[in-house]
């Protein structure tokens, strides 16, 4: 009875898994499980022992068209009686052959698979041409029947539109829709044997096909009248396109298929010819009537693609024909249909805006591409519905533009010298771009913001000389220049210095310019992890950048210290004097101040003043310069500043009266 308890636990977990539907035939009673398992007569009762664990609703008859599988014992396969005493075998053989084969559910699964097919196939079917049927029988000279395979598809701004639901509640299907002003295209190919073909006439005779051509046309659905299709000419024809003189309302021309050679022999159908076909820039001349008003009056346009053949006797026949789904063409603006639901299609330009369609003119002359037949197939299957791309070539620009505005991009020419690079050892994760020289002044003068600690990733264009500093290496200098010691920046000269993260002295006679927008670090300039950010590579104190003079200062001075930039002059109590009508700079440590009375030599104004290494921090070190701050020049100050004439200092630490002091910088004014 151990085996029965094992099956009871299994039946509790899976009470009805894999079992056929229980019928009310009364074949198996409820006392089957009490029969000893070891008896030979109970061998056919092993399978239905789990019936007692089923629910009552399983005993209801299952009305299905197919008969139950328990009716015949010929399909029953039961284990041998000698194997039933082994627990491992009884637990592994719980279902017989009839329980595994559940055919009533296969139809349901197949239906579900058909319903959940990818939507792309459905969209491609809506945009594809469907074959109407062969008009005539095509044979070769041996009497073998051949079929001409034609595949074509629409390309353009097609979508599915829904009509307003009628009053009776019936659901209307979505229809293929486009706007009349939108251009569309047709591409496809034709495949048939590369042998002479003939048409079987009604009289039983055959006539050889001499020429074939493909045409495209449209027919409206109400009366069957033809609808004009026009080809919109190019305003600027694409490169390598044939020169065609087009009229404004020219209809799409027919595409002649280049015939095969007459001396080609029959190779048993091994060679097939594939002709690419296509029309570009097509447009419906008119729109459909009653768009969305009444379903029974709605007009549709249907495109017809026909393959015409000219026989040896001069007769012209339609060998094959393909049509599209009915198309609704809207003539009004899209805003008039905002209440309608539009479903874009994957295969059209409305569903994939990035789809590239090569346009080489108004049509394509179809030329054959011969293919050898593989041994496992009699005809090649054309699986690609893309447009033919053989007649399109892309020509790139021969010379890169040299204007500064076009150089401000992340794409760099490959002609730059890759050996000269800017390397930043303090940023191991950065990459180095090749450098170049860009002539011309900077068209955008820049002033640093008051809250920004430093400029990052945008060095000012400046001449530099060959040198090597601990923070970086710059190997893009001319070979004829000799290294020189750092020079002290004179206050009478006007020269820019690099930002702190470059730490280079500047000269006025260098021949190289550093491009402003060539960044050696791919991270954003505002990122704290940027290579030139102040938190990583700026070893100097913050605020070393000197900004332009305040609004109450003029641009007559060439260099002003950072301390005098941010703090307006105020009178100290220990100094005993303050600036009045004439502006004076703050006093030194001893509180001395002197009137600025020297000839004026103003440098041209500039936007920002980066620091230089030649600055000194000792107040006693003087240097002769022609700098002056514009003596006896009146400036406006806030009210409350004490106005007194300039007075000489009385303490013992004052400098010589001829020396003008400006914080920790000193120079002689005479």
Curated annotation (Swiss-Prot):
Its main location: nucleus. Residues 106-341 bind DNA. The keyword Transport does not apply. GO terms for cellular component: cytoplasm; nuclear chromosome. It is found in: Nucleus; Cytoplasm. Pfam families: NDT80_PhoG. Keywords: Cytoplasm, DNA-binding, Nucleus, Transcription, Transcription regulation. Residues 394-438, 553-568, 611-631 have a biased composition (Polar residues). It comes from the Eukaryota. InterPro entries: Fungal_trans_regulator, NDT80_DNA-bd_dom, NDT80_DNA-bd_dom_sf, p53-like_TF_DNA-bd_sf. Residues 394-457, 496-670 are annotated as: Disordered. PROSITE patterns: NDT80 (PS51517). Residues 592-605 have a biased composition (Low complexity). GO terms for biological process: meiotic cell cycle; positive regulation of transcription by RNA polymerase II. GO terms for molecular function: DNA binding; DNA-binding transcription factor activity. Transcription factor that acts as a positive regulator of nonrepressible acid phosphatase activity. Is a major regulator of responses to nitrogen and carbon starvation and is essential for the expression of genes involved in vegetative incompatibility (like pin-c, het-6, and tol). Vegetative incompatibility is a non-self-recognition system ubiquitous in filamentous fungi which results in programmed cell death. This is Transcription factor vib-1. The lineage of its organism: Eukaryota, Fungi, Dikarya, Ascomycota, Pezizomycotina. The gene is vib-1.
């Amino acid at each position: 009875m151990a085996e029965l308890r094992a099956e009871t636990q299994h039946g509790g977990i899976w009470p009805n898994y894999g079992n056929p539907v229980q019928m009310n035939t009364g074949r198996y009673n409820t006392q089957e499980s009490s029969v000893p398992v070891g008896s030979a007569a109970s061998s056919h009762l092993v399978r239905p022992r789990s019936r007692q664990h089923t629910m009552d609703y399983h005993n209801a008859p299952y009305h299905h068209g197919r008969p139950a599988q328990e009716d015949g014992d010929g399909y029953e396969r039961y284990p041998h009686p000698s194997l039933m005493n082994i627990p491992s075998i009884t637990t592994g053989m719980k279902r017989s052959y009839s329980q595994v084969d559940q055919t009533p559910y296969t139809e349901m699964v197949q239906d579900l698979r058909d319903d959940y097919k990818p939507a792309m196939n459905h969209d491609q079917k809506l945009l594809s041409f469907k074959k109407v049927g062969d008009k005539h029988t095509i044979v070769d000279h041996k009497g073998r029947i051949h079929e001409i395979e034609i595949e074509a598809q629409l390309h353009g701004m097609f979508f599915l539109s829904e009509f307003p639901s009628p009053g009776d509640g019936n659901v209307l299907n979505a229809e293929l829709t486009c706007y009349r002003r939108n251009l569309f295209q047709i591409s496809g190919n034709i495949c048939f044997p590369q042998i002479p073909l003939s048409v079987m006439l009604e009289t039983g005779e055959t006539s050889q096909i001499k020429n074939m051509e493909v045409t495209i046309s449209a027919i409206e659905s109400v009366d069957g009248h033809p609808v004009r299709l026009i080809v919109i000419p190019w305003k600027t024809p694409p490169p390598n396109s044939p020169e065609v003189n087009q009229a404004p309302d020219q209809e799409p021309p027919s595409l002649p298929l280049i015939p095969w050679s007459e001396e080609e022999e029959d190779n048993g159908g091994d060679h097939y010819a594939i002709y690419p076909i296509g029309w570009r820039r097509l447009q419906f001349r008119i729109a459909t009537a009653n768009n969305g008003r009444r379903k029974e009056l709605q007009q549709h346009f249907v495109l017809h693609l026909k393959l015409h053949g000219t026989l040896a006797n001069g007769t012209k026949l339609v060998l094959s024909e393909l049509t599209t789904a009915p198309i609704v063409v809207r003539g009004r603006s899209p805003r008039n249909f905002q209440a309608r639901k539009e479903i874009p299609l994957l295969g059209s330009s409305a569903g994939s805006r990035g789809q590239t369609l090569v346009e080489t003119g108004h049509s394509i002359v179809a030329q054959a591409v011969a293919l050898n037949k593989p041994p496992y197939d009699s005809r090649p299957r054309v699986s690609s519905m893309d447009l033919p791309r053989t007649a399109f070539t892309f020509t790139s620009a021969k010379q890169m533009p040299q204007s500064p505005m076009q150089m401000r991009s992340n794409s760099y020419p490959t002609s730059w010298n890759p050996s000269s690079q800017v390397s930043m050892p303090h940023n191991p994760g950065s990459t180095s771009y090749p450098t170049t020289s860009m002539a011309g002044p900077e068209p955008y003068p820049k002033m640093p913001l008051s809250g920004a600690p430093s400029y990052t990733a945008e060095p000012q264009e400046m001449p530099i000389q060959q040198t090597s500093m601990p923070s970086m290496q710059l190997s893009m200098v001319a070979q004829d220049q000799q290294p020189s010691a750092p020079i002290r920046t004179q206050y009478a000269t006007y020269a820019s210095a690099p930002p702190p993260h470059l730490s280079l002295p500047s000269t006025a006679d260098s021949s190289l310019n550093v491009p402003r927008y060539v960044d050696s670090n791919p991270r954003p300039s505002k990122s704290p992890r940027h290579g030139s950010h102040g938190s990583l590579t700026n070893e100097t104190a913050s605020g070393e950048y000197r900004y332009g003079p305040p609004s109450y200062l003029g641009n007559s001075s060439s260099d002003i210290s950072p301390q005098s930039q941010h703090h307006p002059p105020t009178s100290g109590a220990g100094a005993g004097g303050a600036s009045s009508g004439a502006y004076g700079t703050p006093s030194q440590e001893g509180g001395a101040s002197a009137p600025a009375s020297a000839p004026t030599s103003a440098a041209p104004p500039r936007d920002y003043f980066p620091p230089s290494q030649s600055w000194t921090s000792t107040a006693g070190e003087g240097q002769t310069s022609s700098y002056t701050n514009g003596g006896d020049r009146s400036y406006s100050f806030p009210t409350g500043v004490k106005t007194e004439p300039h007075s000489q200092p009385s303490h013992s630490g004052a400098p010589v009266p001829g020396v003008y002091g400006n914080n920790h910088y000193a120079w002689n004014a005479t």
